[in-house]
Amino acid sequence: MAIITLVGEKLAKPGVEFIFYGPAEPCKTCKLAGVCVGNLEPGRRYKILRVRSMPSHSCPLHEGKVRVVEVVEPSIEVAIEPRLAVVGSVITLKLEDCPDLDKRDLFKPEGLFDGDSVKIIEITGEVECNGKTYKIAKVMRKKE
């Protein structure tokens, strides 16, 4: 289900993904904070589905203007234990440690947290780290 929020005019395009890091200081007193940052969860990745055809709103953070958009949490690729890699299953995510910085996005992907409940959508490959082979799974977070 889509979430309604506000994003800067320059980002307001279908398909654009962003990470919400939490509200900035000026947001705390803004009258639009409820719809803008109130519907988003800090640390999560969002993808813009649709830009609503409504007037833009003033914002001191986004070069003056924000637009109303519909967003969803997209699927994210993550390295998981091979024994857990069953398409369609729901697992509790255990993010593995990997010292290889080039593989960080697979082992600690932004938008997912250790302990998240996720559904495995697809297995897209394999990755090695510390002499161990992991499956690369495309997952969707299951909300409580």
From Swiss-Prot:
It comes from the Archaea. Belongs to the UPF0179 family. This is UPF0179 protein TK0790.
